[in-house]
Every structure is written in C-alpha cells, then in structure tokens.
Amino acid sequence: MNDGGTGLLGDCVKEKLQSDNQVIWKDIQVKLHKFYGNAIYDSWLSVLVYINNEGGKVLLSAPTRFIKEWILVHYLDQILKYWQDEDQSVCSVDICVVNNQDTNLLVNIKDQQDKEVRNNYDHLSSPLDPRFTFDNFVVGKPNELAFAAARRVAESNEPISGSNPLFLYGGVGLGKTHLMHAIAWYIIKSSSKRKIAYLSAEKFMYQYVTALRSKDIMLFKEQFRSVDILMVDDVQFISGKDSTQEEFFHTFNALIDQNKQLVISADRSPSDLDGVEERIKSRLGWGLVADINETTFELRLGILQLKVEKMGINIPNKVLEFLAKNIKSNIRELEGALNKVVAHSSLVGCSITLDSASDILSDLLRANHKSVTLECIQRKVAEFFNIKITDMYSTRRLRTLARPRQVAMYLSKKLTQKSLPEIGKSFGGRDHATVIHAVKQIEKLIDTDSKLRDDINLLTRMLR
C-alpha cells in the first residue's frame, strides 16, 4: 500500500511540476515574442512545444530538423536565459524533432524528414535542357569570363571565394540560361552529392505564393535553404514584388551563412535592376559579376558550325557566314534561323544554297535590318541620360552633356551606315574629327567603365 501511495504521490508531484513548467513556458513565449518581434517569433519560435523538464534539462520540440537547427544557432541562448530567470535549477535547454500532432511521441524523425525533403525536392527545380552543357557552349571574347566562372563553380565542391554569388547578366538569348543548365548538368553527371535547385525567378515567386496560401511556408523555407547550390534565372522578374523580395533576401542570406553557392542571372547588372531593393542589389554584387556581351561575327559563326556538326549535316560555309553576318540579335534567333533553313531543305528536298537561305529567311532578315536613324539614336540617348534633345546639337561642353553626346555619336557609327561627316553634321555641324574622337573615347572607356558599358549595351538592345 505504501508503495502504491508513494507512486501516486510521485505522479501527482510530476504532474504539478509539468503544469508549473507549462506556465513558465507560456511566460517565456510572451517574452520571446516581445524581444524578437512578430516576424521572427511567428516564423520560428511560435512552433516550439514544451515537452518536459528532467533534472533541470528542459526539452522542447520543433516540427522539422531545419527549424530545430536554426533555433539552436540563433535563439537558444535567449531561451535558456529566460528559463533560468524563472527557474535557477535549469541547466540546459534542448530541442528534439517531433510531429506536433502527437507531442507525446518523443522520437527523432531526422531520417524520415530527410527523405521527405528529398521526395519534395524535384518540384523546386525547372527542367534542364539536355543540350545546354559546357561541351555545347561556344566560347568567345563576349562570354569567356562568364564561361570560365560558371565552369569553376561547377567543378568546385565548395563555394568559390570572390564568386559567391556568381551573377551572370546580358541580353536575351546570349547564353545565361545555357551556362546555368551547364553547371547543373556537370554536377549531376559527376555523381556529386551536392543538391541543386535551378528555377526562374517567376517560379520562385509562384512557389512562395503557393506556400503562403497553403500555410506551408516553413516547408518552403526548409526546402530552399537545404540545397547546396541555388540558381535563380531572370531575377529581374521579382522587381516590385515586395513580399517575394523579402523572402528571396532571407533565403540568400541563409544560404550564404551556410556557405552554400548561389548563381543568379538577369538581363542587366545588379545596380541597374529597377524596382529591386537596394539591400538585394548590394548582395547580388558581393561576388563575381560577369556580363555576356553581344555576340561577334566570329562567335556566331562558331555557334553555327558547332550546331551543324552536332546535326550531322553539310551546309556550305558561305551560307553559315551569311547567317552569322545578318542575324545579330541573339543566339536563340540565330539557331532558329538555321533550323528553319534545314527543315525547309529536308521537307522540300532541295539543297541549301545562299539564294535558298536568303529566300527562306527573307522576313527574318528584314526584321534584323530595321532602319536605325541618327534622329532615333539622339532621341533615345537623350531620354536615357535625362537631357534635352537640343543638347545633342549644342556647343555646351558640360560633362553631363558631353558624355551622352559622345555615346550617341558612338552608337551612330556602330548602328548606321552613315559616314563620319554625315554623323558630325547631325550633331550641330561638328566635323568628322570630332566624331572620331568621340568614338575612340567611348571605346576606351568601355574597357574600364563597367557602368558605361552596361548602359551602351542596354541602349543598343533598345535601338535594335
């Protein structure tokens, strides 16, 4: 009888202690909420559940391994402090991973959670194009830095110092996506255990919004922050999306803090991403920023020659040279033109000649040869640099006016067939020597002034 009474008394004491500790935990939660604020408390600390206190060792539970590890690193010291303020006998606070639907089930489900993360991982990424490998990428002066940086990231098992993040930028169809796919394929084929997520900024935004609606935001955070390499294509599309930018910012920081690699692409440099928060633009420029410039004739010809070789067909080199010379907008359009010529030849049963290629692509060639006038260049450059169109003709030599004027002269020489005297005449009657000086000055600055180079590349795309 005495043993039974003692057992019953012991159970009552335990229940009383458990109840007291539950009250203490509720008080601590209030303090944590006040100390950290709504955002941190709601995202991380509100999901903690009190389990027990055995000999001064407090045990809490978290729903996932990721949340547990994050709290252990960032918030555990403050939790312990508050608990010791309430109960000096407490010597430690630990966290286990428990399904919150059954807080009495004290099991570590680390392996199960790892499996769930892996099973849900594939839907994070966009499909990879099997054609986009390093072997199929033609390297030339406009893209050699971007290629070398991408290759280095793929080959390294750790983030590259000075290249994290790797930020690739350039116009549409110049090879940014190709390089990002190539990084992923290289890692996959090398049997690396590194986990990769490649997706567009639009898909990142969609996944985030979906997670908010379904109240799975913690799973979203865990999945994206558990990868070894995160690659986000066309990041300019998060422009103006405040909540998406907030989550992208925190994901970026979390991965950098964990020494994980990021690869980001956009159609312009970080500093030119209008509608993107300054703190994000700053971080995008932390690592290596590599631009992919417009293709040269030699690069376009090399791309066509490689594609023809892969297709296993014979096309006269003069036809390839014709395409490379006349289709300058982007690689995607160039390859599309070649495919059209080859398809026509196969379906109709005729050989590929210079004349047949010219006929087949007549509409495309006309579009690529749209007339760019001197007046159009002057107007667009004036708008871009926020000066008056009359400043293009004036004799004023203020730097804020002279530099845009030189840029306009440079673009006039590059984008039109006008002679130097004709260009000079359209700029307030200046002589050809002034035009030559302006062109040389801009060519010199392009090599050293990345901001000016970006501006000119953007203006060129706007004018064509």
From Swiss-Prot:
Residue numbers spanned by region Domain I, interacts with DnaA modulators: 1-90
- Tell me the InterPro entries matching this sequence: AAA+_ATPase, Chromosome_initiator_DnaA, Chromosome_initiator_DnaA-like, Chromosome_initiator_DnaA_CS, DnaA_C, DnaA_dom, DnaA_N_dom, DnaA_N_sf
Say where the protein is mainly found. Answer: cytoplasm
Tell me which family the UniProt entry assigns to this protein: Belongs to the DnaA family.
Provide the species name.
Answer: Ehrlichia chaffeensis (strain ATCC CRL-10679 / Arkansas)
One record GO biological process: DNA replication initiation
Q: Which protein are we looking at?
A: Chromosomal replication initiator protein DnaA
Notes on the domains: Domain I is involved in oligomerization and binding regulators, domain II is flexibile and of varying length in different bacteria, domain III forms the AAA+ region, while domain IV binds dsDNA.
Region (Domain III, AAA+ region) residue spans: 127-345
The alphabetized UniProt keywords are: ATP-binding, Cytoplasm, DNA replication, DNA-binding, Lipid-binding, Nucleotide-binding
PROSITE patterns, sorted: DNAA
What is the role of the protein in this entry?
Plays an essential role in the initiation and regulation of chromosomal replication. ATP-DnaA binds to the origin of replication (oriC) to initiate formation of the DNA replication initiation complex once per cell cycle. Binds the DnaA box (a 9 base pair repeat at the origin) and separates the double-stranded (ds)DNA. Forms a right-handed helical filament on oriC DNA; dsDNA binds to the exterior of the filament while single-stranded (ss)DNA is stabiized in the filament's interior.
